[in-house]
From Swiss-Prot:
This is Uncharacterized 9.9 kDa protein. The lineage of its organism: Viruses, Varidnaviria, Bamfordvirae, Nucleocytoviricota, Pokkesviricetes. It comes from Vaccinia virus (strain Copenhagen). It comes from the Viruses.
Length: 85
């Protein structure tokens, strides 16, 4: 063993003894959910784009903003549920 090597680095001990909550499969599924958007999300973005291209009143715009915020909350809630199981 060289003088600059720490003894803890040499021994390969398991970091986590107990089963971790963050399973790799669950994290991968959450990442795939974020990376591959579902079809209704794509259609929602297309509707947003077509509405913004056409004449947009302020009430419609605020409705779209509230819809986007609530959708964001739903996505975060689903991710929290997936992680907690």
């Amino acid at each position: 063993m060289n003088h600059w090597q720490h003894p803890f680095i040499v021994q390969k001990a398991p970091i986590y003894k107990r089963k971790s909550r963050f399973d790799r499969d669950k994290l991968l599924t959450i990442l795939s959910l974020f990376l591959t958007p579902p079809q209704f999300l794509i259609s929602l973005v297309m509707k947003l784009f077509t509405i913004s291209v056409s004449s947009l009143s302020t009430r419609d715009f605020t409705n779209l903003i509230t819809l986007a915020v609530s959708f964001n909350r739903v996505v975060i809630f689903v991710c929290v549920i997936l992680i907690s199981f």
